[in-house]
C-alpha cells in the first residue's frame, strides 16, 4: 500500500471515530416555543455520560425528569413524562446538534402534534 493510501486510511479512520462519539451537550439549555396551549419557556439541564443522556426539564408548571435519553453522534433523543390536567402526557424529543450552542428539536406531544423548537446553550 502506498504512503498516500495509508495516510488517507488513517485520516478516514480518525474522522469516523470522532463523528461516532456523542457530543457533549452537558449543561443548561433554554428554549421559547409555540405550542397548542400557547408560548412556553423551558430550561433543559442535560448530563451526558457516554451515549446516555439524563437531566431535568423545568417549565412554568414545574419540573420533569428526562427519560430514555440518548446522544448518538449529533442526534439527541429523550422523553418528557408529565401530568397535564391530571392526565399522564408523554412528549418525545428528537433533535440534531446544529452547533456547540444550538440544538434543533422536533417534539411530539402524545402522538398527536409535532412542535419545532431550537434550544440554545444558557450563557
Residue ranges and their predicted role:
Residues 1-8:
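Bacterial N-terminal signal peptides that target proteins for export
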Residues 8-17:
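Bacterial N-terminal signal peptides
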Amino acid at each position: 500500500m502506498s504512503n498516500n493510501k495509508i495516510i488517507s486510511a488513517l485520516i478516514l479512520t480518525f474522522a469516523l471515530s470522532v463523528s461516532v462519539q456523542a457530543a457533549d451537550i452537558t449543561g443548561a439549555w433554554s428554549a421559547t416555543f409555540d405550542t397548542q396551549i400557547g408560548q412556553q419557556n423551558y430550561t433543559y439541564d442535560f448530563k451526558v455520560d457516554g451515549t446516555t443522556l439524563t437531566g431535568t426539564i423545568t417549565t412554568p408548571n414545574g419540573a420533569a425528569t428526562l427519560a430514555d435519553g440518548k446522544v448518538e453522534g449529533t442526534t439527541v433523543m429523550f422523553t418528557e413524562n408529565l401530568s397535564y390536567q391530571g392526565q399522564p402526557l408523554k412528549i418525545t424529543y428528537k433533535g440534531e446538534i446544529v452547533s456547540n450552542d444550538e440544538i434543533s428539536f422536533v417534539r411530539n406531544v402524545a402522538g398527536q402534534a409535532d412542535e419545532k423548537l431550537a434550544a440554545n446553550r444558557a450563557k
